[in-house]
């Protein structure tokens, strides 16, 4: 089966916004007008097609990114293929949005015309900046009371530090909103209410908007000619670019992320959606317009590029795992190069495992279509993959590449979680396992002593959302304990310990003597074992027992029972007995030897230090820095980003609980922060004494 659409006619884009700016409604209208939906799904009546989990339809919010493929004929009469990702905007925790942005070529940022740029808009905008995603802006809800298009334009400049190129002006506002002025064609589009937005009339610009239209067209041309020397020169000499040239310049500037074309309308009242679809065709990039994806060649370890070309070897990135009630586990993948056939064997280069593609599905929200083949630029859902998780690369087994090594750091915070009722017990286990499969930075374990279920993650917020998703998606009610920080212990100086284990009680006894040097491991946090035995004072077959004995006690340090990091042990001497010695005897001896030595080798408590990035408007910088210092934070630096200031700091995790609430009240909800584990650092002695007192009583 040959490719149906040329790759230059693909548009892979997402819709990003603050909660309630109308993302799902806008996507619904796109599906309706592009012919994928026979009935307009309304979030208000629980029929939206993109929101296909029951909980989403009940609540009118989008929980998971649903991917859908649809088609649209642009103004030039050419059909384009759209792969759309609908992303959630309702959570602080925006890993879903990040995952989507990594595999998209462009995005539409939705604004609520009443609220303008809201805090979550700032967050997703910054994420898109990070991945350099070309964006257009759609000022939605123009029919709402208090809708103000011009204020939204101003807020894009002041709040986001971005340049919006206004492409349309609204005709009327609030209940009087009728249509838009097209600033390129210089005409008016007025929608007919009775046609569900399918029909509109092209008329002259209303008299009261003529002057404003001329002013904004002038601004539009001034902005776009700046990116092209020849156009700029012509403009300064009084030669105006024609409409095709203006469109070409808008496209170039959008793809180069120099500015963002801005449109307006009301998806709910079916006005302004079709021109937005035309704009997706005209201004957002195809996979050919963006730089080739870089990867690591598995054979040579050198950097290579994969281009969006069917003739290149297959490479794709798994960006989301979803559980489908009918098909089971689905792995959503973006194909960057080559082509994929159903039943093909692919290599997961991250897990170093081969996978077979069972079924290949084209997703339309909650309905699915089996396909035999997929090509570069496609976003597909694969069924039947056993090993693959988020961030894995799948590729041609003969041309192996790793597209993006994703680091999933060790969890730094854990809480005990218990089901509220007996009936929730089994459901909770299932829910936690499913959530762990979807999110590699989340872990589940059982505490051996108490039998409690412990969930661990990257921060307080992360675990809050896991518990919330469990309740919402799996209907499991659970009680959670107080968060616990994952402290560690280490030793700070060299110490030599000589220990003899002797046990005689009739029959065969036990005997083993070990002399071991313990010291900090200069190579990192791992445990390192070495043997310098010469002359057979400890026979070769007993040496693994010595190593095993030490390893068995590293999980509980001498200060407060936390796991130990960065220990090096060197066995230098010992003694054995022909009859009474055994591997077990040497294991017991080395275990006791280490316990004795750890107390004398300068045992020290370590705490997880988080790399914290706060993005705040300038007005709040002093307060934010003062607050971080009061949390034992070390400021690493600050820089300007647009009109915001980015503050980087290392802060102990123990002092970051409830930080999100503090930051919100400090900045009136306008600052955001992100936090990742960075390294373990010694705990100051006064704090260490408190921690030891608290945890020693529990051990």
UniProtKB/Swiss-Prot annotation:
Highest taxon in the source lineage: Bacteria
Domain tr-type G span(s) in chain numbering: 8-288
SUPFAM superfamilies tied to this protein: EF-G C-terminal domain-like, P-loop containing nucleoside triphosphate hydrolases, Ribosomal protein S5 domain 2-like, Translation proteins
Binding site for GTP: 17-24, 86-90, 140-143
Primary location: cytoplasm
Cellular location(s): Cytoplasm
One Pfam family from the record: GTP_EFTU
GO biological process assignments: ribosome disassembly
Keyword Amino-acid biosynthesis: no
Xref: SMART domains: EFG_C, EFG_IV
GO CC terms: cytoplasm
Keywords: Cytoplasm, Elongation factor, GTP-binding, Nucleotide-binding, Protein biosynthesis
Keyword GTP-binding: yes
Molecular functions (GO terms): GTP binding; GTPase activity; guanosine tetraphosphate binding; translation elongation factor activity
Function: Catalyzes the GTP-dependent ribosomal translocation step during translation elongation. During this step, the ribosome changes from the pre-translocational (PRE) to the post-translocational (POST) state as the newly formed A-site-bound peptidyl-tRNA and P-site-bound deacylated tRNA move to the P and E sites, respectively. Catalyzes the coordinated movement of the two tRNA molecules, the mRNA and conformational changes in the ribosome.
Family, as annotated: Belongs to the TRAFAC class translation factor GTPase superfamily. Classic translation factor GTPase family. EF-G/EF-2 subfamily.
Protein name: Elongation factor G
Organism: Allorhizobium ampelinum (strain ATCC BAA-846 / DSM 112012 / S4) (Agrobacterium vitis (strain S4))
């Amino acid at each position: 089966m040959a490719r149906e659409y040329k790759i230059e006619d693909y548009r892979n884009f997402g819709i990003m916004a603050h909660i309630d700016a109308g993302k799902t409604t806008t996507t619904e209208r796109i599906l309706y007008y592009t012919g994928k939906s026979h009935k307009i799904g309304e979030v208000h009546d629980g029929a939206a097609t993109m929101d296909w989990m029951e909980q989403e339809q009940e609540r009118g919010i989008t929980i998971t990114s649903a991917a859908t493929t649809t088609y649209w004929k642009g103004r030039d009469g050419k059909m384009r293929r759209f792969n759309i990702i609908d992303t959630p905007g309702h959570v602080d925790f925006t890993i879903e949005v990040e995952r989507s942005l990594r595999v998209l070529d462009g995005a539409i940022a939705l604004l609520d015309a009443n609220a303008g740029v809201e805090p979550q808009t700032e967050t997703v905008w910054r994420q898109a900046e990070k991945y350099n995603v070309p964006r257009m802006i759609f000022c939605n809800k123009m029919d709402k009371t208090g809708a103000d298009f011009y204020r939204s334009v101003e807020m894009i400049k002041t709040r986001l530090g971005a340049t919006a190129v206004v492409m349309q002006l609204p005709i009327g506002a609030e209940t009087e909103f009728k249509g838009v002025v097209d600033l390129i064609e210089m005409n008016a589009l007025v929608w007919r209410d009775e046609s569900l937005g399918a029909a509109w009339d092209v008329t002259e610009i209303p008299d009261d908007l003529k002057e404003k239209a001329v002013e904004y067209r002038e601004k539009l041309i001034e902005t776009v000619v700046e990116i092209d020397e020849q156009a700029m020169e012509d403009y300064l000499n009084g030669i105006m670019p024609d409409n095709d040239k203006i469109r070409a310049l808008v496209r170039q500037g959008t793809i180069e992320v120099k500015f963002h074309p801005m449109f307006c309308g009301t998806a709910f009242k079916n006005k302004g959606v079709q021109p937005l679809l035309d704009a997706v065709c005209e201004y957002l990039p195809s996979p050919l317009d963006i730089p080739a994806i870089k990867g690591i060649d598995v054979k040579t370890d050198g950097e290579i590029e994969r281009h969006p070309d069917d003739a290149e070897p297959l490479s794709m990135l798994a960006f989301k795992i979803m559980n489908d009630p009918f098909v089971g586990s689905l792995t959503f993948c973006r194909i960057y190069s080559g082509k994929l056939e159903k039943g093909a064997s692919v290599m997961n280069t991250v897990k170093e495992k081969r996978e077979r593609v069972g079924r290949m599905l084209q997703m339309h929200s909650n309905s699915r279509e089996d396909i035999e083949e997929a090509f570069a630029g496609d976003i597909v859902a694969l069924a039947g993959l056993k090993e693959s998780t988020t961030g894995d690369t799948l590729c041609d087994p003969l041309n192996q590449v790793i597209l993006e090594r994703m680091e999933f750091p060790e969890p730094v915070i854990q809480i005990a979680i218990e089901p509220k009722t007996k009936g929730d017990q089994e459901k909770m286990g299932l829910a936690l396992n499913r959530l762990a499969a979807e999110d590699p930075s989340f872990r589940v374990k059982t505490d051996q002593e108490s039998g409690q279920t412990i969930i661990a993650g990257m921060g307080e917020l992360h675990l809050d959302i896991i518990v919330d998703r469990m309740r919402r998606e799996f209907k499991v009610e659970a009680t959670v304990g107080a968060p616990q920080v994952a402290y560690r212990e280490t030793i700070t100086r060299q110490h030599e310990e000589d220990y003899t284990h002797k046990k005689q009680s009739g029959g065969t006894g036990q005997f083993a003597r070990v002399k071991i040097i313990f010291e900090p491991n200069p190579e990192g946090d791992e445990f390192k074992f070495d043997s310098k035995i010469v002359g057979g004072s400890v026979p070769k077959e007993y040496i693994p027992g010595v190593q095993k004995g030490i390893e068995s006690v590293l999980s509980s340090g001498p200060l407060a029972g936390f796991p130990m990091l960065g220990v090096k042990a060197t066995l230098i001497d010992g003694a054995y007995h022909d009859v009474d010695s055994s591997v077990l005897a040497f294991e017991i001896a080395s275990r006791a030897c280490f316990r004795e030595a750890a107390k004398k080798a300068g045992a020290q408590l370590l705490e997880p230090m988080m790399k914290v990035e706060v993005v705040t408007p300038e007005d709040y910088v002093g307060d934010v820095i003062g607050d971080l210092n009061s949390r034992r934070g070390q400021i690493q630096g600050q820089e300007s980003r647009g009109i915001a200031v980015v503050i980087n700091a290392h802060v102990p995790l123990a002092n970051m609980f409830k930080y999100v609430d503090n930051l919100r009240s400090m900045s009136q909800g306008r600052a955001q922060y992100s936090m990742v584990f960075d390294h373990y650092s010694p705990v100051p002695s006064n704090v260490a004494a408190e921690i030891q007192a608290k945890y020693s009583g529990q051990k």
